[in-house]
Structure formats: C-alpha cells, structure tokens
C-alpha cells in the first residue's frame, strides 16, 4: 500500500531537560553522507543544542539535504536544530525499517526538491512528511528489515576489509621504498641493502 511518511512516522520535538554532563551531542558534522551508522559525536556539556533524541531515532540532516546525511542513533542524546529527529509509529511502521526509508535516493531527492533557502537550504518536516512510498504489511516489513540490515552488515564488513587491504598494500609498498632508499649498487656486488 502507498503511504505518506507522516502517516507512519513522526518528528520528535522533545528537548533535553536534565543534566548535560557526559550526554552525547550530535551535530551535522557527525552525520556521514550515505551512512546509516552514527560513528562520531561530542561529549560536551557546554552545548547550546537542546533537541533530544532516543536510541533508535533516525537523525536526518535537514540542512543541505543533497549531502544525504541521516543515521540511526545508537544511544540517547542531544542534537543540533538542523537535525530532524524522526521516529516510527510502531503500529504502522517497523522502527528497524525506517532508516532505509530515510537513507535512500528517492527520499533525499524529495527533500532537496522541498528545501527552502539559497545559501543553506533546509527541509521542513511539514514537507518531508508528504513523501510517498510503497509500504508492505508489518509481517513483511520484518523480513524486509532483516534482509536490509544483513545487506548493510555485509557492506560494512566489505568496507572494513577494503580499508585493511589498502593499509596492508600501502605498508608493503612503503616498506619496499624504505629498503630501496637504503640500498646501494656496485658493479661487482650488484644491489645491496644497508643493514
């Protein structure tokens, strides 16, 4: 069935009222483009941010939506006002599926098209909530979410493997350069490496 995002999810507008000491703080700079995982944040108590989020909330970078910044919060904390906190309505949308609805090209294209402002365009929830998409029944949503999270885990593992491979190749390459720099050549003895 086709639904609007606002029918199955809502913007959370809660503010942090407690002590801020040690509370994670998320700004736009902490949201990596195209990534579902939130891997960096600050732990400052001196922030002016007041918007709060819960573990499992989707944090959407509403300023410059073309940067494709959205991630799942792995903890509760405080975030910038330029982040829209989105939460699933569990009776309509499986919370584990929401990140994949937000972190996709169709949604970002819609958000960019609805953004207002020239230097720093921002998308508002009132517009984002009108994003339409096809949504299966809850039972099928579970299967789909499991499949998408498994694919995401495989993608993350692949990225780590590529980074490790790149590091290994670079260290081997640089090791050869170091040995060559310490080498000397003589007509009788050929190439010799300094000890």
Where are the model-predicted features located?
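A short glycine-rich beta-alpha junction/loop motif
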Residues: 63, 77-84, 117-139
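A structure-centric signal for secondary-structure junctions around beta-strands
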Residues: 20-22, 80, 95, 128
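Non-catalytic DNA-recognition/assembly elements of restriction-modification systems
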Residues: 1-18, 130-146, 153-195
């Amino acid at each position: 069935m086709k639904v609007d995002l606002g029918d199955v999810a809502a913007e959370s507008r809660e503010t942090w009222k407690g002590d801020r000491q040690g509370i994670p703080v998320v700004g736009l700079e902490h949201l990596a483009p195209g990534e579902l995982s939130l891997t960096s944040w600050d732990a400052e108590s001196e922030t002016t941010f007041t918007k709060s989020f819960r573990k499992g909330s989707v944090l959407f970078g509403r300023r410059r939506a073309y940067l494709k910044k959205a991630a799942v919060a792995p903890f509760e904390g405080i975030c910038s006002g330029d982040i829209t906190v989105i939460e699933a309505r569990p009776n309509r949308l499986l919370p584990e599926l929401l990140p994949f609805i937000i972190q996709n090209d169709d949604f970002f294209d819609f958000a960019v098209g609805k953004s207002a402002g020239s230097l720093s365009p921002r998308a508002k929830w009132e517009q984002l909530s009108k994003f339409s998409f096809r949504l299966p029944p809850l039972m099928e949503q579970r299967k789909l979410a499991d499949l998408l999270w498994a694919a995401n885990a495989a993608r993350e593992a692949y990225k780590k493997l590529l980074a490790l491979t790149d590091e290994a190749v670079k260290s081997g390459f640089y090791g050869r350069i170091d040995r060559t720099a310490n080498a000397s050549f003589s007509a009788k003895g050929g190439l010799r490496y300094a000890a």
